[in-house]
């Protein structure tokens, strides 16, 4: 890629952060703080708003959007879609549960649209693990059935649903980008996309994270950045220089969201160090 194209890609990449880091903070204060630290977007975990997204009124969703816009901050979308819920399962043999799960994903997509978001990240490992007696092939059939039914409506809403491969330590279904892409190809809907994640892709054994980015990021719908130590970029041993260089070289021009799991350094300090690391890496990627 030429230097001018790399600069264009960097200019298009926007930096966001996931809101669950700001535990028990007022939503307005989260938005103001995130914006003051230099982020352009906020990615929301539904469980931080209500036990279920359907518990929120239309008025409350519109209010949250207005609060973000006043910051000013974009709502990127939703992630941790099924976390801390009960009764939903993607790969269960029970057709009624699969239908209920699909219906809830549609409700999440509608909430994303109202919030002004553009994507949802489907990780939720505990709602896709293989149940006893269910094979990988059967799980693929069940998941494909759910997505084939709901993706036309999600697409009409203008929302991308991004499938997140996760490490074998987290789930036994969809562990690699290649596996996720096979399911995406099977469903064959333009709004069903791959999600990439530094921690998750670090568990893949056949290629490095930069190599996986080179291979898969051109068609990816979203990207999460964190260290394998569960803290933010720049707070561990992961070198984000090659990662962001590969991302820029791939032509990826979407959001990069900071997603962390170890909150102990504090929300503001984590957010501050993370964006500083990502900006340094992006600046270096165009030199």
Regions found by a protein language model. Give the residues of each.
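Histidine-acidic metal/acid-base catalytic patches
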Residues: 2-38, 65, 69, 116, ...
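Residue-level detector of anion-binding/catalytic polar loops
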Residues: 40-41, 74, 118, 160, ...
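Active-site-proximal loop/turn and secondary-structure-junction residues that shape catalytic pockets
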Residues: 21-23, 46-48, 81-84, 126-128, ...
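Active-site acidic/histidine proton-transfer and metal-coordination neighborhood
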Residues: 28-29, 67-70, 87-193, 203
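Short hydrophobic interaction/assembly module
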Residues: 61-83, 87
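Residue-level preference for long, well-ordered alpha-helices that form the structural scaffold
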Residues: 53, 57-60, 94-101, 135-139, ...
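Glycine-rich, proline-tolerant flexible connector loops at the mouths of alpha/beta enzymes
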Residues: 45-65, 124, 131
């Amino acid at each position: 890629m030429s230097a001018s194209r790399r600069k264009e890609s960097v200019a298009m990449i926007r930096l966001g952060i996931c809101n669950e880091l700001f535990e028990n903070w007022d939503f307005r204060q989260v938005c103001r703080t995130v914006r003051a630290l230099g982020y352009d977007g906020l990615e929301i975990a539904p469980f931080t708003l209500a036990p279920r997204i359907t518990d929120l009124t239309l008025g409350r969703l519109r209010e949250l959007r207005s609060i973000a816009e006043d910051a000013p901050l974009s709502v990127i979308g939703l992630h941790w879609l099924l976390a801390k819920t009960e009764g939903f399962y993607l790969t269960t043999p029970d057709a009624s549960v699969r239908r209920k799960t699909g219906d809830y994903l549609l409700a999440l997509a509608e909430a994303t649209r109202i919030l002004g978001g553009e994507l949802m990240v489907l990780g939720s490992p505990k709602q896709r693990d293989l149940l006893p007696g269910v094979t990988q092939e059967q799980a693929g059939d069940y998941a494909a059935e759910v997505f084939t039914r709901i993706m036309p409506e999600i697409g009409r809403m203008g929302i991308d649903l991004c499938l997140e491969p996760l490490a074998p330590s987290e789930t036994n279904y969809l562990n690699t980008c290649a596996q996720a892409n096979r399911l995406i190809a099977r469903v064959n809907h333009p709004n069903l996309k791959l999600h990439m994640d530094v921690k998750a892709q670090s568990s893949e054994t056949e290629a490095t994270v930069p190599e996986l980015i080179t291979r898969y990021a051109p068609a990816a719908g979203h990207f999460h950045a964190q260290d394998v130590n569960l803290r933010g970029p720049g707070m561990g041993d992961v070198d984000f220089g090659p990662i962001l260089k590969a991302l820029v070289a791939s032509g990826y021009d979407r959001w990069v969201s900071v997603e962390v799991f170890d909150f102990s350094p504090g929300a503001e300090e984590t957010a501050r160090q993370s964006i500083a690391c990502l900006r340094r890496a992006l600046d270096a990627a165009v030199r």
